[in-house]
Amino acid sequence: MSEKSASNNKAEFKRQSSPFREIISADHPIYKPAKGRYWLYVALPCPWAQRTLITRALKGLAPIIGCSVAHWHLDDKGWRFLEEGDGKTNERHWFDIAGGISSVNLNTSTPVANIPNNAHRLLVDGTDEPHYGYKRLSDFYFKTKPDYKGRFTVPVLWDLETCTIVNNESSDIIGIMNSAAFDEFVGEEYRQVRLVPRSLEAQITEFNSWVYDKINNGVYKAGFAECAEVYEREVTSLFQYLDKLENLLDKKYTDLEAEYGKNNKDKILDRYFAIGDTLTEADVRLYPTIVRFDVVYHQHFKCNLATIRDDYSRIHTWLKNIYWRHEAFQRTTDFTHIKLGYTRSQPRVNPIGITPLGPKPDIRPP
C-alpha cells in the first residue's frame, strides 16, 4: 500500500514484483511441510494479505500456520507490530482465523476520529510479534537479505526453522496452502477442499487473469494515477470490467433460477459462485477487492462512477452470499482496519487523513 515507490515516471501505477518466491513441499530441499514451522505476517487493510488469511481458514491451516497482524497504519518505515507490553497475548490468538483481532466480529466499522495513528490496543489495532520481538516487518526482510532494497510488503510467509522469508507473493502463498503439502496435518474435511479443481483449472486461470489486472489492480491504477488522463482511462477500464463481471454473474444466477425456480433462493445461493458451483480460488481472489469497493475504493480512490450495492445487483448478491454464509471471508474482514488503513496511510491520496463515516452499513444484511 506504499504510494511513492509504487508509481513510475509516467504517472501510472506499477506494482513491484515480489522477490521471494519459494514453495513448500516434501520434495523441496529446504522448505518442507511441518506443523508450527511456518508463520504468516499480514495486515488487515491489505486485500492481498486477506487472500492468504481466507485460504488459511478454508484449508483448516489456522492451527498449523500461526499468524501475526501488523498495525493498520502504514507509515514511511512500513508495517509495524505492537509491543508485548501493550497487553497480554494468549497463544491461541496466533492460531485464530484473523490472528485474534477482535473487531473482525463486529460486521461494521466504528467512528475513528478519536483513534490516533499511534494507537496501541493489543488485539484491536494489531498484535505483537511473538518470536523475535521485532517491531517492524522490515526486520524480516533484512534478516533474510541484509542488503534488501525493495518495499516491505505483506503478506509474508516466514520459516521459523531457517529464519528466512519463504514467499511474499500472495498468489504463491495461496497456492502453497491449497496444495496437498499440509494435508497430513488437517482433517479429512479440509483435505477435500480444492480451490482449483482440475476440471475448472483453465476457467479459473482465465478468470483470475483479467480480474487481477482489471479489477484487483485496476482500483490501484485509478487511485494512484498522477494525472487526470491516466485516472480517467483507468477508471473507465475498471468499470468496463465490473460490467463484464456483472454480466457473467447475471448469467450464472439466471441459469440457477431456471434450474431451481426463482423462489428457491437458498438452493441458488448454495451454488452461486464466480466459477463452478462451489467456492474456488476465483472467489478468494475477487472478494477482497469487492468487499472494499464501496467502503474505500469508491471515495478514496475516486472509483465513483457507481457503487456495488446500488448499481451491480448480481455482484452485490454474490458479495453478501460470500460474506454472510462463509466464515473464512467474514471473519477475516475488518472494516475499521480497512478504512483506517487506506485513509490514514496514503497522504498523497487523502492529505488530511479524515476517514469517512459512510457508507453505512459497511455491508448490507443478507
Swiss-Prot record:
Pfam families of this UniProt entry? GST_C_2, GST_N_2
Q: Which organism is it from?
A: Saccharomyces cerevisiae (strain ATCC 204508 / S288c) (Baker's yeast)
Q: Where is the GST C-terminal domain?
A: 197-349
Residues annotated as the enzyme's active site: C46
Q: What is this protein called?
A: Glutathione S-transferase omega-like 3
**Which family would the database say this protein is a member of?**
Belongs to the GST superfamily. Omega family.
Task: Please name the SUPFAM superfamilies in this protein's record.
Answer: GST C-terminal domain-like, Thioredoxin-like
Keyword Ribosomal protein included in the entry's annotation: no
Gene Ontology terms describing biological process: glutathione metabolic process
Tell where it localizes: Cytoplasm
Q: What does its record list under induction?
A: Up-regulated by tert-butyl hydroperoxide (t-BOOH) in an MSN2/4-dependent manner.
Q: Which keywords appear in this protein's UniProt record, sorted alphabetically? A: Cytoplasm, Transferase
Keyword Cytoplasm attached? yes
Gene3D superfamilies, per database record: 1.20.1050.10, Glutaredoxin
Q: Which reaction does this enzyme catalyse, per its entry?
A: RX + glutathione = an S-substituted glutathione + a halide anion + H(+)
Q: Please give the function described in this protein's UniProt entry.
A: Active as '1-Cys' thiol transferase against beta-hydroxyethyl disulfide (HED), as dehydroascorbate reductase and as dimethylarsinic acid reductase, while not active against the standard GST substrate 1-chloro-2,4-dinitrobenzene (CDNB).
EC numbers: 2.5.1.18
Q: Which CDD domains match?
A: GST_C_Omega_like (cd03190)
InterPro entries tied to this protein: Glutathione-S-Trfase_C-like, Glutathione-S-Trfase_C_sf, Glutathione_S-Trfase_N, GST_Omega-like_C, GST_Omega/GSH, Thioredoxin-like_sf
